[in-house]
């Protein structure tokens, strides 16, 4: 036994025990009992220099200062030296600061503020014991302070609205969605334990969903979800902490659940049965509309239907096309039906969806058939070639009129050869074949020559037309001929042909070919153009010689001289005395026509529709050119098939370079193929029958003549003075106000021929015309201007006394411009008719008030316009019809136009209102009445006393006479009273009165002598005879009145 080892171990053990006993560190913990308010201190000893863990806890959200000091630390080294205690960590010298403090001498740790567990769930305090030199006497100690949790946070859902979806007819307890909610309180604590609950469901017929209380999973309660009933559900879910306790906090969220569609509805057709009638050999793309009804979601694969044939369509005659936007099927005929084969059909249709049926109804699906009865109607079909083509072999030994065979059409209705058709050749290259129009026997027109053999390229393909005149139908058959063997003879001609010729036959239905020949010894090249037809061309032996090169160079040199010649060309000028370009006069657009004949533009006639008369055939076997009635329409399968037959005839002439040379047969080649009914043929002759043309245009002329006789005759006076459109309403008015707006200076440059007209238009003095009637006393044209203070006297009128200023009276004479003077004619009654119809306001009975438009602008210009006042024939009275409003402000304008009265009394005066302010203008135009006296037909109101008053009366027409124009007294300065064109029963009076001022009334007019007539027949036409709304008058400058038709 090793006793020294045991002795050493025992000594060391005793030393450690002594050391531990002498270095003891105590910790006292204060325990505060909140129930009874007592405080207890517990001493904890740390052995082997290890700190005892700090077990004190603080409650969040409360004031824990009443529990201070919450802990106390002590070091055994404080027995023999001074010890300083310090702490550090979160809540002390790290955020949040200052929550814990320590007494450096006693080691007591105090809490100073309220703590939040969600911010800091616990605190770690590092404790140190230091000597006077600041050195650690003990190893740092970690104290943990736990924060007790309270329920101060509600649950929070991760989304405000949760979205989910599930198929309809799903099994019960199928997971729909899972809700997610959190609580910020202490995990695994009752404060953070959330319980879920469904509090509301929309629609709320019956509960369809359940939720797991702890996990938040939403599942189906049953398998009764039906999208066709409800396509969406809305749930309200509440989450409460403390496991759903009454003292817990809660939150709510929304859940939207979409029900997905499955193919759980069997489609069906709207009509269970139907019946149809169709014609044989017809096609129809819209025979029947079949609507499918499906309750699944529209435009989805579960809704889209497919209609199929169960039976009855074994021949593939019908097809069904579905419209995916409407789910409607269209029954179509894609193959013609033959009445002789099928007379009735029973179609059985079924329907299904594009998507497979859902497993919930898979066992319930049963195919339901929809019956459609189809009746085929018989039509007259005509004849066809069966088979459609035949092939023959032709050798060089076969001569003219050799019978190749027969090609007979078959009547589809009877199945026998047709006996009501005639046969003609359609496409017949090189005029090789001929066919008998009755029997359909095909023969060779002539023996095949070497030229034909080379041109056809050993292969002939032509067409034969079978024309049924009774049914107006045409069918086409194809002829194929193989040219075999050798020993083909050359073409025989009556004489040698010098030079070359070209025969070309080209149309829209046959392959083109070209044959060129110079003599019988030339070498040809043959080029195929398709469809077995070849083109022969002579070998190229033309060369570009020196003469041609020289001519080409000469041409370029001449072109180089053109710019120099243009430099010396007078382009419009006349430096050498030439006339130059003649300017085109204005208004010459109608003198240049785009057609070559005078008169109106000729009508464009479609000459292609003119039928050329045909020559009747002399030989039945030789088919002439068929006319337009030889082609008929075939209508099969709903499409219009129209074909034109072919035929030839020999004219004995050949058309070469615009001339005809005898000795060469001409082929009148027909266009063959598909054309429209009654389409015209085109022959290479290019001419038309002139007899037919003459007949055509004669019928056209008679048609125009008949049309002119049927039109209403215009042998009466037109409404307007010009042809064309009527004049706008109100275009003829008082033109005396627009004279200064017209610029007539351009009349000075017209030349001597228009000098006289220019002088008349400008109002200059002209030499009087010689008076052929010496009994007509001439009158002076000089104006009568009495001096100031004198009284100008008019015959039969009272004198005019000047009161203020100067009065000037100007009289103008008007002489007729014709070669002679006509006798004066009486003025007819302008209102000889009963009721008067105007284009503007009119009436047939009673008193018509004229429409007066008053623009009452305060302190502005006032305008009153009354136009075309018309009264009836019975007892009308114009008294009060011209009542004008009281225009109180300045610048008043009153216009009365075309006052027309019937055969009744016209009031002696036309009352003018009281325009009391300055600048008043009163205009009365065209006062017309029947044969009765008009005494003082215009009376001035005495109260027009202000300045700048203008009163104008124009064209006062009466049947018996005009007494005069009287003006009221008391006019101020600058007044003007004018009477223009006063027309009486004996003549025409023109006067113009003016002056600087009139102080007394004007009681008369200056009248032009005895004007008995004019060349223009002033009143030869009854006013209103052509149109009651038209006044045939025209006003020129200086009150000159001219009446025209």
UniProtKB/Swiss-Prot annotation:
Localisation per UniProt entry: Cell membrane; Cell junction, Desmosome; Cytoplasm; Nucleus
Biased composition (Polar residues): 1020-1045
Glycosylation sites: 36, 110, 180
Predominant localisation class: membrane
Bilayer-spanning residue ranges: 547-567
Extracellular-facing ranges: 50-546
BP terms from Gene Ontology: cell-cell adhesion; homophilic cell adhesion via plasma membrane adhesion molecules
Propeptide: 24-49
GO molecular function: calcium ion binding; gamma-catenin binding
Membrane topology: Single-pass type I membrane protein
Cellular component terms (Gene Ontology): cytoplasm; desmosome; nucleus; plasma membrane
Domain Cadherin per the UniProt entry, residue ranges: 50-158, 159-270, 271-385, 386-496
Signal peptide: 1-23
Region of interest called Disordered, as start-end residue ranges on this chain: 1019-1045
Desmoglein repeat-type repeats, residues: 814-840, 841-870, 871-900, 901-928, 929-957
Quaternary assembly: Binds to JUP/plakoglobin. Interacts with PKP2. Interacts with DSC3; there is evidence to suggest that the interaction promotes cell-cell adhesion of keratinocytes.
Domain notes: Three calcium ions are usually bound at the interface of each cadherin domain and rigidify the connections, imparting a strong curvature to the full-length ectodomain.
Identification of the protein by name: Desmoglein-1
Species the sequence originates in: Sus scrofa (Pig)
């Amino acid at each position: 036994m090793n006793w020294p080892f045991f002795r050493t171990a025992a000594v060391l053990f005793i030393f450690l025990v002594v050391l531990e006993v002498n270095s003891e560190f105590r910790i006292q913990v204060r325990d505060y009992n909140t129930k009874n308010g007592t405080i207890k201190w517990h001493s904890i000893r740390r052995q082997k220099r290890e700190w005892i863990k700090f077990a004190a806890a603080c409650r969040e959200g409360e004031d824990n200062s009443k529990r201070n000091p919450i802990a106390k630390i002590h070091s055994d080294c404080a027995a023999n030296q001074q010890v300083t205690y310090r702490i550090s960590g979160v809540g002390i010298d790290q955020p949040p600061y200052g929550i814990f403090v320590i007494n450096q001498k006693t080691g007591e740790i105090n809490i100073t503020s309220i703590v939040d567990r969600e911010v800091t769930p616990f605190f770690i305090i590092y404790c140190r014991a230091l000597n006077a030199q600041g050195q650690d006497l003990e190893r740092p100690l970690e104290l943990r302070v736990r924060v007790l949790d309270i329920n101060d946070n509600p649950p929070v859902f991760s989304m405000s609205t949760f979205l989910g979806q599930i198929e309809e007819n799903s099994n019960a307890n199928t997971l729909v969605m899972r809700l997610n909610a959190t609580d910020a309180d202490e995990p695994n604590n009752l404060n953070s334990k959330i319980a879920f609950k469904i509090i509301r469901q929309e629609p709320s017929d019956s509960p369809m969903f359940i939720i797991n209380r702890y996990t938040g999973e939403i599942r189906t309660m049953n398998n009764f979800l039906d999208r066709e009933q409800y396509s969406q559900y809305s749930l309200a879910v509440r989450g409460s902490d403390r496991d759903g306790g009454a003292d817990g906090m809660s939150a709510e969220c929304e859940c939207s659940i979409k029900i997905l569609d499955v193919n759980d509805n069997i489609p069906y057709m709207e009509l269970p049965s139907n019946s149809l009638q169709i014609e044989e050999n017809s096609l129809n793309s819209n025979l029947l509309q079949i609507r499918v009804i499906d309750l699944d979601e529209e435009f989805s694969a579960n809704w889209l239907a497919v209609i199929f044939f169960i039976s009855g369509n074994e021949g593939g005659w019908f097809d069904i096309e579905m419209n995916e936007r409407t789910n409607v099927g269209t029954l179509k005929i894609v193959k013609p039906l033959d009445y002789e084969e099928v007379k009735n059909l029973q179609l059985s249709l079924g329907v299904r969806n594009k998507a497979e049926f859902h497993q919930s109804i898979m066992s319930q699906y049963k195919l339901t058939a929809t019956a459609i009865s189809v009746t085929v109607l018989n039509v007259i079909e005509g004849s066809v070639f069966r088979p459609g083509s035949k092939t023959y072999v032709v050798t060089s030994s076969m001569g003219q009129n050799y019978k190749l065979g027969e090609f007979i059409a078959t009547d589809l209705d009877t199945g026998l050869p047709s006996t009501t058709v005639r046969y003609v050749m359609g496409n017949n290259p090189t005029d090789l074949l001929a066919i008998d129009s009755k029997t359909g026997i095909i023969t060779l027109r002539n023996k095949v020559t070497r030229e034909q053999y080379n041109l056809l390229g050993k292969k002939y393909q032509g067409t034969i037309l079978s024309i049924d005149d009774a049914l107006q139908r045409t069918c086409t058959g194809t002829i194929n001929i193989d040219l075999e063997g050798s020993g083909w003879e050359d073409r025989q001609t009556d004489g040698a042909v010098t030079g070359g010729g070209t025969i070309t036959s080209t149309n829209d239905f046959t392959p083109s070919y070209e044959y060129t020949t110079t003599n019988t010894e030339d070498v040809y090249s043959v080029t195929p153009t398709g469809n077995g037809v070849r083109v022969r061309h002579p070998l190229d032996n033309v060369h570009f010689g020196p003469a041609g090169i020289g001519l080409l160079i000469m041409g370029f040199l001449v072109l180089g001289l053109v710019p120099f010649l243009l430099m010396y060309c007078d382009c419009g000028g006349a430096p050498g005395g030439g006339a130059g370009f003649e300017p085109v006069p204005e208004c010459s657009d109608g003198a240049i026509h785009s057609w070559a004949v005078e008169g109106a533009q000729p009508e464009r006639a479609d000459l292609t529709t003119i039928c050329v008369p045909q020559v009747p055939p002399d030989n039945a076997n030789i088919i002439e050119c068929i006319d337009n009635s030889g082609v008929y329409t075939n209508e099969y399968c709903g499409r219009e098939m129209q074909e034109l037959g072919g035929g030839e005839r020999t004219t004995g002439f050949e058309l070469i370079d615009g001339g005809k040379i005898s000795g060469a047969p001409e082929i009148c080649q027909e266009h063959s193929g598909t054309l429209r009914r009654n389409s015209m043929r085109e022959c290479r002759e290019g001419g038309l029958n002139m007899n037919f043309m003459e007949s055509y245009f004669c019928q056209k002329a008679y048609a125009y003549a008949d049309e002119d006789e049927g039109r209403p005759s215009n042998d009466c006076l037109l409404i307007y003075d010009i042809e064309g459109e009527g004049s706008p309403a109100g275009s003829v008015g008082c033109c005396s106000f627009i004279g200064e707006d017209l610029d007539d200076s351009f009349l000075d440059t017209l030349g001597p021929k228009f000098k006289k007209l220019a002088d008349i238009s400008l109002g200059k003095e002209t030499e009087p015309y010689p008076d052929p009637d010496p009994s007509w006393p001439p009158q002076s044209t000089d104006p009568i201007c009495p001096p100031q203070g004198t009284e100008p006297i008019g015959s039969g009128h009272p004198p005019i006394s000047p009161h203020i200023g100067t009065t000037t009276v100007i009289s103008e004479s008007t002489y007729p411009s014709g070669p002679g003077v006509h006798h004066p004619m009486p003025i007819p009654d302008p209102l000889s008719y009963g009721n008067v119809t105007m284009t503007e306001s009119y009436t047939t009975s009673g008193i018509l008030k004229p429409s007066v438009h008053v623009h009452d602008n305060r302190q502005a210009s006032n305008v009153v316009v009354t136009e075309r006042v018309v009264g009836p024939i019975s007892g009308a009275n114009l008294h009060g019809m011209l009542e004008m409003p009281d225009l109180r402000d300045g610048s008043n304008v009153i216009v009365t136009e075309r006052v027309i009265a019937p055969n009744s009394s016209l009031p002696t005066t036309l009352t003018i209102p009281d325009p009391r302010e300055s600048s008043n203008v009163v205009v009365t135009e065209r006062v017309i009445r029947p044969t009765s006296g008009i005494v003082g037909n215009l009376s001035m109101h005495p109260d027009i006393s202000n300045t700048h008053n203008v009163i104008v009366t124009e064209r006062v027409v009466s049947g018996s006479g005009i007494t005069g124009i009287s003006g009221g007294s008391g006019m101020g300065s600058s007044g003007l009273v004018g009477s223009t064109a006063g027309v009486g029963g004996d003549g025409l009076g023109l006067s113009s009165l003016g002056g600087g001022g009139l102080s007394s009334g004007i009681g008369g007019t200056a009248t032009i002598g005895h004007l008995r007539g004019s060349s223009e027949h002033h009143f030869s036409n009854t006013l209103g005879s052509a149109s009651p709304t038209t006044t045939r008058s025209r006003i020129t400058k200086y009150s000159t009145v001219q009446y025209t038709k």
